[in-house]
């Protein structure tokens, strides 16, 4: 898929720089364990451990997560490997037993007629505040969609968001597939979605590994304040820029020479273009700058979404991250 064009990046990066300068001038200081928010984990990478074991499998995963400092998880609604977790009250009990909260889940079947009341009931029983979706699921062909499809999909989700909000759940969408596509005229779909989605009815969850496709998260967080209430964290080889490289530079931390230390460790990685998965903090992303901007973006929750061994390293880094 084509990346962010140079013109698109330059037209939007100025707003991000100005917003960050304003925050610095205002004396904003953020503490370690970024923004004072609990360190979270998405359950999807750990689904195989739950499987047919259901609540017992969930308990085993949560025990391990708590032991490394994870206090918040994002669940998956009952389906696939999570199909045994149909009783929201029982899920809540297992969570409470381990001192872990679940403010959101990725819900499947939100658009299916008749499904919404059951999904809302399940989320409410667990004590969730957000109903999330992996993708809005608009039609794309070879990575391309149409403006009409964007408008119709946004209209549908604005209506769903009004229903869920009345039931105590804020609708939110992650970005995969449809959200990471382009329009036939070459524009990125993501900013157009932000134009047509009601900012009060549908919030956003930014997938960090997508930054090389749809652009710098700092740019989005500062240009659309209050709209990004959640994020999935992965290590990203941001130093490679976007595709094509001429599109501009992403939020990259200073070079090893400027830091007076060693490099970030592994090359490539999850969301970074191949190789071993990169842990958060072992990559080239300037996470201090990302979390500074995320406060403007309205971040309430973030979840490491990586395999267990990489999650352990990412959590260790987040525990020490002092955002100032």
Question: Which residues are covered by each model-predicted region?
Answer:
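Short amphipathic alpha-helical segments and helix-helix/interface helices
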Residues: 62, 92, 120, 161, ...
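Short, small-residue-enriched loops and turns at beta-alpha junctions
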Residues: 49, 80-84, 109-112, 138-140, ...
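Acidic/histidine-rich catalytic cores of soluble enzymes
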Residues: 72, 164-279
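A short, acidic, amphipathic alpha-helical segment used as a generic capping/interface helix at domain edges
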Residues: 283-294
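Active-site acidic/histidine proton-transfer and metal-coordination neighborhood
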Residues: 14, 21-25, 66, 94-203
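Flexible, glycine- and charge-enriched loops at secondary-structure boundaries
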Residues: 51, 55-58, 88, 143-150, ...
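Substrate-binding cleft of secreted/luminal carbohydrate-active enzymes
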Residues: 294-311
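N-terminal pre-domain/capping segments
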Residues: 2-130, 226, 233, 238, ...
């Amino acid at each position: 898929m084509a990346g962010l064009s140079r013109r698109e990046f330059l037209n939007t990066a100025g707003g991000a720089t100005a917003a960050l300068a304003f925050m610095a001038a205002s004396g904003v200081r953020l503490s370690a364990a970024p923004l004072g928010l609990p360190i979270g984990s998405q359950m999807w990478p750990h689904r195989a451990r739950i499987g047919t074991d259901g609540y017992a499998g969930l308990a085993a995963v949560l025990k391990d997560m708590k032991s490394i400092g994870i206090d918040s998880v994002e669940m998956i609604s009952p389906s696939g490997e999570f199909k045994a977790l149909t009783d929201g009250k029982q899920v809540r009990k297992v969570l409470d037993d381990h001192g872990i909260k679940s403010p959101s889940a990725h819900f499947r079947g939100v658009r299916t007629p008749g499904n919404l009341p059951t999904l809302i009931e399940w989320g409410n029983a667990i004590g969730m505040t957000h109903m999330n979706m992996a993708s809005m699921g608009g039609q794309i062909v070879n990575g391309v969609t149409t403006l009409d499809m964007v408008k119709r999909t946004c209209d549908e989700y604005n209506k769903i968001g009004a229903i869920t909000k009345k039931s105590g759940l804020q609708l939110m969408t992650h970005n995969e597939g449809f959200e990471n596509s382009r329009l036939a005229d070459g524009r990125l779909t993501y900013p157009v979605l932000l134009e047509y989605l009601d900012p009060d009815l549908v919030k956003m969850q930014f997938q960090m590994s997508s930054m090389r496709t749809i652009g710098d998260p700092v740019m989005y967080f500062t240009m659309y304040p209050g709209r990004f209430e959640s994020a999935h964290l992965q290590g990203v080889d941001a130093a490679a820029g976007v595709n094509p490289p001429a599109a501009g530079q992403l939020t990259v931390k200073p070079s090893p020479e400027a830091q007076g230390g060693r490099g970030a460790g592994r090359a490539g990685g999850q969301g970074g273009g191949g190789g071993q998965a990169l842990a958060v903090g072992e990559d080239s992303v300037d996470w201090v700058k990302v979390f500074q901007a995320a406060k403007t973006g309205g971040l309430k929750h973030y979840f490491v979404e990586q395999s267990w061994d990489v999650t352990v390293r990412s959590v260790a880094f987040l525990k020490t991250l002092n955002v100032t």
